[in-house]
Amino acid sequence: MPERLPAAITVLKLAGCCLLASVVATALTFPFAGGLGLMSNRASEVVANGSAQLLEGQVPAVSTMVDAKGNTIAWLYSQRRFEVPSDKIANTMKLAIVSIEDKRFADHSGVDWKGTLTGLAGYASGDLDTRGGSTLEQQYVKNYQLLVTAQTDAEKRAAVETTPARKLREIRMALTLDKTFTKSEILTRYLNLVSFGNNAFGVQDAAQTYFGINASDLNWQQAALLAGMVQSTSTLNPYTNPDGALARRNVVLDTMIENLPGEAEALRAAKAEPLGVLPQPNELPRGCIAAGDRAFFCDYVQEYLSRAGISKEQVATGGYLIRTTLDPEVQAPVKAAIDKYASPNLAGISSVMSVIKPGKDAHKVLAMASNRKYGLDLEAGETMRPQPFSLVGDGAGSIFKIFTTAAALDMGMGINAQLDVPPRFQAKGLGSGGAKGCPKETWCVVNAGNYRGSMNVTDALATSPNTAFAKLISQVGVGRAVDMAIKLGLRSYANPGTARDYNPDSNESLADFVKRQNLGSFTLGPIELNALELSNVAATLASGGVWCPPNPIDQLIDRNGNEVAVTTETCDQVVPAGLANTLANAMSKDAVGSGTAAGSAGAAGWDLPMSGKTGTTEAHRSAGFVGFTNRYAAANYIYDDSSSPTDLCSGPLRHCGSGDLYGGNEPSRTWFAAMKPIANNFGEVQLPPTDPRYVDGAPGSRVPSVAGLDVDAARQRLKDAGFQVADQTNSVNSSAKYGEVVGTSPSGQTIPGSIVTIQISNGIPPAPPPPPLPEDGGPPPPVGSQVVEIPGLPPITIPLLAPPPPAPPP
């Protein structure tokens, strides 16, 4: 390569140019030369800042998002550009662009002085076109300012204005560019920067757009076409002006024949070839909207990166490789199950589900889907609302009993504790309303079916009597239950402004909203829900009480191949491992026996241990199911997403006048249908070991026996054990004589220090209990038999079973 021009000559030429430009600029624009010094200082600052950006900045490039198997999810970009190194650009392309745009590229030092001075002199004589003599360096400067630096329309106009001032800035930056980089580096930067029309920026994307090949494979005629288009991408578009594009291509080939005599024969042959472009531009889909059933996950990835300090704008320009945690082998059955029970064409009803892999170091999001299509056509049922990971719907219903239970275990109760299950529960100070006939300023709760008068925590979670958990939250305290929900994973509830749907004038968080009013109904899950966070609650319990943010990122690689740290919140041991593991066991009967999800589990052929909980809101406008094993955690949430929510019905899922959708219907069916195909994909499935501390309760959790004592003695014994004693006794059916102390409510184990009510006999013997259910949760034992005779067969004896009690809804 020829030596650079001597510095002295360069300076003299620049000085002469500057002198001419100063005279012209002063004569035409600044009649009072006193302001010239200030203008010059500001111009110097502009040049210095522009040069720094030019040398250190990066051009916008496409970021590619892929799943865990390397399949592309989406391309995210503001300019469709893929940077490639010099050795990935064909020499044909390098020779073509130099030949047509700057044949003295190898000889000058960034500026073609003859052409530049001619252009400036022409400006002085009235020719406002100062483009004469622009080198590749100068073109690079102008294109960089236009395509990268300029953010506003005014800045873009300034980047291409035909004035000596811009030309002088361009010259100074071009000289700096030439001093900093080699010619090969400048040429590579140029070819990676410029526009080639049809939204193709840089030679790699241009080669793909017009020919469907890589830049390294461009032949003579292809390279010549692209090089010719740089002059005017709109007028030389081969799809709208093929004749003009062909003529310009051949002009480029003619210059190459002149400048490259050794390749003349091949270049003449290239002139005889047709344009050879694809029938249509090979454009790249842009953004999450083109990601199909992975679009909501794609949106969540961007939201997660934004929380980590990497904005959507940075992603759209940064040229990142975003390796995500999405597992296509999990995503496919999840989407299929969702669509099976909630058609994508179902108006006004959404079904969302996410699957998370538990862990103590990370909670990786394996799948995320909705029955809704991600898009802008509202009439077609499309939406761009982040439904799977935002607060939506009317709530998850009885699933929230998990939080009340966890708070009680944290206070010292064990899962062997017997919970009272009265037919009706009423209390003041816990909100108001609820069941029919509720007194003023009183919260009233009834059950949806008939239940035994008491049951242990495991059975209560499986069969879901409302009154048991209404009474339990009155003992635990609303604040503790809310705090537990947030700790385990419902983190959105702590965000300011989340209560606006319930109090538009307030900036309160949902947590503060519920606590301020001390709403006992929180245990019945009546407030909107983030379904991804509910899945993460399950992941926290499956991870031995370790909460981690639901993480969609496996690895983030920058354009230089370096890994970028992505940090949002850190993992935290939010409840003791013993509590989480024991609660997982307490939730293990929901899918068996009389559990509210047993029918769905059986229909899916589910035969593995798991923990789960169904939930339904009182008005049947939303319902859900959360379930987990030691290998995966997931929640399905179905809700009315119309502007005027109404009751939902089951089988098939639809709007109706009087709702009958329960968590044990479509939500749990969706969960088991989705998880059954991949149930054994991640290793052995088993329940964790329990912790005696949370099975039998902490010291002070056992209620002493007071049967046979007088009332005063019973009160004293309970107080000595650390319990509070209710002022009023409770009259119960008993074979003991009238007025005798026969027990307490609760009895056995409960929360240490909680309120205990003394039970007094009313002298009326209790009714005999119904036949007990077998241990395996099967049908009740036979109460008789019947002989059936069928001709040709011996007599058949059929056992007669007592009708089982109806399975209560969650």
Positions of PLM-derived features:
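A penicillin-recognizing enzyme superfamily signal
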Residues: 320, 324-346, 353-355, 368-370, ...
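Short, well-structured active-site flanking segments
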Residues: 106-116, 203, 263-265, 409-432, ...
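N-terminal type II signal-anchor transmembrane helix
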Residues: 1-64
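Short pre-catalytic segments that frame enzyme active sites
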Residues: 71-82, 205-209, 234-238, 312-318, ...
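Peptidoglycan glycan-strand catalytic modules in the bacterial/periplasmic cell-wall system
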Residues: 59-261, 373, 462-464, 473-477, ...
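Non-catalytic structural connector segments
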Residues: 263-323, 349
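Glycine-rich, acidic and aromatic/proline-enriched surface loops and short helix-turn segments
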Residues: 139-150, 192-199, 216, 220-232, ...
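Ligand-recognition elements built from short beta-strands and adjacent flexible loops
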Residues: 677-810
